[in-house]
Amino acid sequence: FMASAMKVIEIYYARPIITDREDAVDQTERLHGDVEFKDVTFKFGKHIVLDNVNFKIKAGQTVAIMGETGSGKTSLINLIPRFYDTNSGEVLVDGVNVRKRKLSQLRSQIGMATQDVLLFSDTIDGNIAYGDSDMSEEDVKHYAKLAAANEFVEKMPDGYETIVGERGVGLSGGQKQRLSLARALAIKPAILILDDTTSAVDMETEKYIQDSLRNLDFPCTKIIIAQRISSTKDADMIIILDDGKITEMGTHDELIAKKGYYYEVFKLQNDGF
């Protein structure tokens, strides 16, 4: 009991490390969605996770990130909403260092859906509309449809009023991922970050989701971590990470021509090509 009580006290008195600077930019208008990494190095302790990373993403582009487990993909995307700070270099959104932006304003315009999904103990409706109690039922269904979730939700006895999360019904990994994607889309983000979000869905559902993402009714920069070539081949730019460094960068055709890591993955997923 005492150990649990001490843990509660520790959490209660904890203070966030990442906070707004006194000179933080107050920008209430919608972001365009330009993202730039400029000489970014990031460490966990003494371990270098990202090593002098440089790239630019123009607003509205789709960029895919690939690499082996532990190559730094998730750490990279977590720097954009400033979950961590870089050790050196800059992460810029619309030309402004994220350290100089107000956290609430930055994060409110970044939608994230990850492989490991957290669902709140609430209705499906409440999970999708999380943070916006005024969202209409029509809008909730719209984003569920974009994420290929509407069909399985409507088959449930209580539909969108079904309770999920710790005290709710059990959902498959693919169903959870689709609800997480619907929640990320529902805020109409200027920047959408997907971390292996379709890893647990079948190929047909993945294709449906890709079509939805290509035809969103709002401007959006999309950054997608994926292991399937089917998820990356149509991206405007593909970034290959290896041990925290960018080893390849270009379009699908350009990387196939280089015959490096991307080409080997392509061959493997296409039965030797």
Identify what each model region corresponds to.
Residues 13, 18-273:
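ABC-type nucleotide-binding domain
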Residues 1-11:
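Cytosolic ends of transmembrane helices, especially the final helix of ABC transmembrane type-1 domains
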